Amino acid sequence: MIIKNLQAFSRLLILNSPLIAIDYGSKKLGIALSNQERSIAMPLNTITEINKKIVITSLLSIVEKYKVCGVVIGMPIDMSGAVTEQTNMVMKFAEEFTKSINLPIYLQDERLTTKAANNFLKSFGMKRKDRDNNDDAVAASMILETVLDSMKNI
């Protein structure tokens, strides 16, 4: 189920169980995982498959492996706050994913996270190809970190 309010989302979470975050794109998606205490977000991996059934199967495997209690999906909204084609694509994916999983899903504004992740990796001297292979997972960790920080204030 998609939860639009962070406070309501946090009330549905199981204690000592991690969250995952997804930075969903048309060519790949980044995955991040929190620790069980939900105090730290870490990049986990990047899925380069674009077939939605395979993507969902991969995500369900991650959810099961790490005993995840909730999902955060980055919502790409343009700088003015308007809905874009990418926003609609992510919303459609989120709605499809809810049919396969019985966990709360929270949609988090992800403006500029991929760019910030790319700049972060660049600051370590990472080459463009390597940055492109890792920026979505780092962006997912930034999205998740935003949610974790916000949940501390609830």
Swiss-Prot record:
Superkingdom per UniProt: Bacteria
Pfam families with a match to the protein in the record: RuvX
EC code(s) of this entry: 3.1.-.-
Tagged with keyword Flavoprotein: no
Gene Ontology terms for molecular function: nuclease activity
Subcellular location as annotated: Cytoplasm
Annotated GO biological process: rRNA 5'-end processing
GO cellular component, one term: cytosol
Keywords: Cytoplasm, Hydrolase, Nuclease, Ribosome biogenesis
Function: Could be a nuclease involved in processing of the 5'-end of pre-16S rRNA.
Family per similarity comment: Belongs to the YqgF nuclease family.
Protein's recorded name: Putative pre-16S rRNA nuclease
